[in-house]
């Protein structure tokens, strides 16, 4: 027999299944739609050859702009009703966490999560959050953020350091695990598509990789770790231009030099290029193409 068990996180979190169920069991994390699945939902067929055709690329780019904003929550994509995402957040996230962990002051829980959602993809420290919220305890902030991660709503990553102690101490970065929630829940009037692009890239990387960010003299968005070694460095920039090109490229090349890598990846919204700097190969690829090539 096969049993598929579902339920509210207020009742049972995935990490507790092993202690509650006897015998063998497999946990399968069902994530929001990938870009390829989004295209399939739209009835748009894509293959490795077609993504290089001009007429196909125009259509794909149009769909990608929608995916970047709306994310991949299936019910929301089908009915286009923002209330569906609001309800998931209020019922599954806020209420379930409050019940499961017996949070008395739901207002400060909500305040913290609102702050993080409005500052996604940015660096933060627990003390900086303490200064801008009404939460007086760093330990409470840590606990509240861990609750959010356990519901698969968000994820924090560390600055890479060979010292685990420094990883814990240094600033974190916060990502929401579906862009649709950002669009619906963020209080910001102007939407920064650059941050949305970075958040989307993180979610793809987070599915299969251990991810850190790099910060030295310059910064690089993502480091991919496999078997305790840095295997890839990735910078995300919505559009390379005269104002940001030096900063973005130098952050990437500094990380490449630091970890002795010959190649680096710079993901953009639509630009594509390849160039060599100081013997280092930098490949510039649109995120939509990178997402589809990863799945082929």
What is the predicted role of each segment?
Residues 1, 22-26, 260-263:
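Short glycine-/polar-rich loops that comprise or flank the Walker A/P-loop
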Residues 2-8, 29:
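Structural recognition of the conserved hydrophobic beta-strand(s) that form the central parallel beta-sheet
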Residues 8-15, 267-273:
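Short, polar loop motifs at secondary-structure junctions
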Residues 11-26, 42-43:
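Short regulatory helix/loop adjacent to the ATP-binding pocket of P-loop NTPases
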Residues 26-36:
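Conserved AAA+ ATPase "SRH/arginine-finger" region at the nucleotide-binding site
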Residues 36, 40-216:
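Interdomain hinge/linker elements that couple catalytic modules in large macromolecular machines
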Residues 146-153, 157-296:
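A cross-kingdom feature that marks ATP-driven nucleic-acid transaction machinery
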């Amino acid at each position: 027999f096969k049993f598929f068990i579902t339920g509210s996180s207020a009742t049972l979190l995935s990490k507790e299944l092993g202690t509650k169920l006897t015998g063998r069991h497999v946990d399968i994390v069902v994530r929001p739609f990938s870009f390829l699945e989004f295209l399939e939902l739209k009835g748009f067929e894509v293959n490795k050859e077609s993504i290089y055709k001009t007429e196909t690329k125009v259509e794909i780019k149009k769909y990608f702009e929608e995916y970047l904003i709306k994310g991949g929550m299936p019910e929301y994509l089908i009915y286009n009703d923002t209330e569906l995402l609001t309800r998931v957040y209020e019922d599954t996230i806020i209420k379930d966490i409050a019940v499961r962990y017996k949070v008395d002051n739901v207002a400060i829980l909500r305040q913290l999560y609102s702050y993080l959602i409005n500052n996604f993809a940015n660096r933060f420290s627990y003390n900086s959050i303490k200064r801008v919220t009404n939460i007086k305890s760093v330990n409470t902030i840590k606990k509240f953020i861990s609750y959010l991660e356990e519901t698969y709503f968000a994820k924090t990553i560390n600055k890479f350091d060979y010292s685990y102690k420094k990883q814990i101490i240094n600033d974190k970065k916060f990502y929401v695990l579906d862009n649709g929630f950002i669009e619906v829940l963020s209080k910001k009037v102007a939407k920064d598509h650059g941050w949305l692009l970075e958040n989307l890239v993180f979610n793809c990387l987070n599915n299969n990789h251990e991810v850190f960010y790099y910060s030295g003299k310059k910064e690089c968005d993502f480091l991919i770790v496999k078997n305790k070694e840095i295997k890839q460095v990735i910078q995300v920039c919505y559009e390379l231009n005269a104002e940001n090109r030096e900063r973005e490229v130098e952050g990437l090349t500094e990380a490449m030099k630091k970890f002795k890598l010959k190649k680096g990846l710079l993901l953009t919204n639509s630009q594509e290029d390849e160039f060599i700097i100081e013997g280092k190969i930098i490949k510039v690829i649109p995120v939509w193409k990178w997402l589809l090539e990863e799945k082929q």
